[in-house]
Amino acid sequence: MTQPKILVLIPARMASTRLPGKPLLDIAGLPMIVQVLRRAQEANIGRVAVATDTKEIADAVIAHGGEAVMTRPDHPSGSDRIYEASCKLDPAGEAEIVVNLQGDFPTILPQNIRDVLLPLSDPAVDIATLAAQIHTAEEDAAPSVVKAVGSPIGERRLRALYFTRATAPHGDGPRYHHIGLYAYRRAALERFVSLPPSPLELQEKLEQLRALEAGMRIDIGIVDTVPRGVDTPPDLETARRLLSKA
């Protein structure tokens, strides 16, 4: 069977209040966005590019041998940005799968980027994402930790039913920390960005709920660990420490 063509896109912009200029902050000798680019390249699943509205970010990526595409500054979400980027980079629509990798995941494992493709082996799945089991009460209670609620459909696989910032589901049993890494079928991404924001999306401030409310199927692959995002100065120091040892 022919392997599908895959386009990995990393949306990046400067609008961080807690870490100004976040994509260009140095981590182990490279701008953070270039560290994320390296992890995507190491996954070796397809073409990789950074989608940005900021010339300084594009220049940094290109200076380190990467590919960047400029997008409009007024996109409401990363998904809209990667859709515009996919249309510019692949106007013929040859890429069947588009991966959305957050630009603040410099320590993500390349294997996790490969893992997010696995649920799409089922043709009924529109969008694939990842989650890891929650092991601490602090993580369980934190609204900043998005919980993935799903029905088990196989070993280390869930069919997504809901995503929430609340502690859910109630009662005994595992709960899962959602990881913001997505693999879209090209047609699913096009449909997703054409939809208006949905009521639950606006209430929870979670754009993936737009897809669920529209009847799209999201499957979740279970992985062992959550990649460390960089949102605060302590996060930045942790990433620097981890990658300085790599």
Swiss-Prot record:
Key words, A-Z: Cytoplasm, Lipopolysaccharide biosynthesis, Nucleotidyltransferase, Transferase
Involved pathway(s): Nucleotide-sugar biosynthesis; CMP-3-deoxy-D-manno-octulosonate biosynthesis; CMP-3-deoxy-D-manno-octulosonate from 3-deoxy-D-manno-octulosonate and CTP: step 1/1; Bacterial outer membrane biogenesis; lipopolysaccharide biosynthesis
Gene3D superfamilies per UniProt: Spore Coat Polysaccharide Biosynthesis Protein SpsA, Chain A
Record-level Gene Ontology MF annotations: 3-deoxy-manno-octulosonate cytidylyltransferase activity
Cell location: Cytoplasm
Cited InterPro entries: Cytidylyl_trans, KdsB, Nucleotide-diphossugar_trans
Cellular component, GO, one term: cytosol
EC class of the enzyme, as a word: transferase
Annotated catalysed reactions: 3-deoxy-alpha-D-manno-oct-2-ulosonate + CTP = CMP-3-deoxy-beta-D-manno-octulosonate + diphosphate
UniProt-listed Enzyme Commission number(s): 2.7.7.38
Keyword Transferase in annotation: yes
Pfam families the UniProt entry points to: CTP_transf_3
Main localisation: cytoplasm
Role description: Activates KDO (a required 8-carbon sugar) for incorporation into bacterial lipopolysaccharide in Gram-negative bacteria.
NCBIfam families assigned to the protein according to its UniProt record, in alphabetical order: kdsB, PRK05450.1-1, PRK05450.1-5
The family this protein is said to belong to: Belongs to the KdsB family.
Protein name per the record: 3-deoxy-manno-octulosonate cytidylyltransferase
Species, as recorded: Bradyrhizobium sp. (strain BTAi1 / ATCC BAA-1182)
Gene: kdsB
